[in-house]
Amino acid sequence: GLAWFLLDIAVDWIALARARGDTARAERWQAACTGWRTALHNEAWDGGWYQRAFFDDGTALGSHARTEGRIDLIAQAWAVLSGAAPVERQRTAMQAVQAHLVHDDSGLLQLLTPPLRHAEPSAGYIQAYPPGVRENAGQYSHAGVWAVMAAAALAVHDQYGENSSENNPENSPKAAHVSAVDLPYRYFTYLSPAHRAQHPRWGLVYGA
């Protein structure tokens, strides 16, 4: 997922370097971009969506071959936002998002699925979260926004646009009925990390 973002940034900086007459640096970055594109178009493509990352032993995170963490939202969104993936693959990847990560009945747009429980190699700290909480198959708002932006870029906003409301915790099905005492637990991560330590509970926004 980060490679798409890096590629997008590098392309912009190549233009700046050329404008400044820094040809050597621009050419070095251009060569790096060529290598990244090749890897993304080949190794990163999983047949129906893009894989999120690779462990040191070459095992992929976000692959259809996995039983946990089979698909990840960020890789699909940035494949579109970077403009570097072929358009047909962009559409296929976002169709996979709709099929696997969007849940209209509960108003959630998951970061990944299925949750990570016993996956080896471990994905690190996100695997320590309970299933459905934060990055471990919960809804993570920045990735949700990127997905809506990607859908808009593909001119299918009518299909995905409603997810912009799903990405807003105020529009949770239970939001209208929540009591004042519940608010700290629903919004603690948007206030400060210290607040989380003071109120160590998960919020409704994560779908836990």
Spans of model-derived segments:
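Acidic, mature catalytic/reactive cores of soluble proteins
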Residues: 1-162, 169-208
